Amino acid sequence: MYVSTSSGDRQTLLKAIRFEKPDYIPMTFHINAACWNHYDQNALLDLMEAHPFLFPDFQRPAVPMELEFDANARADRPYTDDFGCVWQTAMDGIVGSVHTHPLADIGKYASYRFPDPEKSMGLGPVDWNAFEAEVARQKAMGLMTYGDLRHGHTFQQLCDIRGYMDALMDLSDEEPEVLDLLERLCRFNLAQINHFLKADVDIVRIPEDLGMQVGPMISPSLFREYIKPLYQRMLEPVRKAGKIIHMHSDGDIRSLVDDIIEGGVDIINLQDLVNGVDWIGEKFRGRTCVDLDIDRQKITPFGTPAEIDAHVRHCIETVGCPDGGLMMIYGLYPGVPLENVKALMDAMTKYACFYR
């Protein structure tokens, strides 16, 4: 049972994105699959049941729950994805990292085979007819609908295929094979985006981690020269179709964010403390909708309930405004004390109506 629940109904989400005075701040509380092996399941379910604003569709399951994990999040079971990258993880539910890069030897590029975007999402098979039917079903229910590129669609995918250091050196050296690889990745991504648009989704989400704890994973100059043009090509059909564009990156992206959002990004999803709450507020408040990722490194795992409450309020006061432009999301992972989990759920519920 993996829970990723948003408290935002369709109209409230649209009002928040468009700065049209939403009735409340949309809140999403995501519980990572690993949590169900880490915490007492009933204790976690009790917290969910006690917070219906965050979990409006909650139905208590029988325990112990039968758990299933994504193919690249299974402990000690290496997984080879459709690009030939081999993933490994040490904990069930935690997405692993790529340990084997199919083009560690670039001399093999001529024989390297790409997955077919008509059949693959990159991390597994896709049935586009079933996708269209599911989008239609959700629309009929009045729900917001999404088309999600796989996480790490371009730069991270290049690093997974080639290896991080080799990828950066290849870009610096303008290696023709790697430039061609990026072009093929862009075409693969565009094929999937076109399927999202054919299905008439409301929001296209384009997630890729570009930041480290301090600074970006790629220099701003290399990003502007090689990655940004591909981003712009992927955004163009979405903009033309009038769809909402949601961009995500973890890490410190302050030196990249102007280039990331240039050209019509409607929502930027970034992390609070690593970028600085004050900086985020100065940069985006009242201008671009922020889907703010609440701290998972410092305050929620190691702070007090009072500090958690104060942090959520500070984020809302600094980044939000009465007109909207703010959503908040938290990802729960093993290690956060249950009293802090409760404190965060309480704060997200309490302050959602801060401007009303």
Regions found by a protein language model. Give the residues of each.
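Secondary-structure transition motif
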Residues: M27, F53-F58, T80-C85
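Active-site loop segments of alpha/beta catalytic cores
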Residues: M1-Q41, T80, T89, F114-R356
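A contiguous, low-structure linker/loop signature
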Residues: D70-S120, A140-M144
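Segments that shape or occlude catalytic/ligand-binding pockets
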Residues: A34-N72
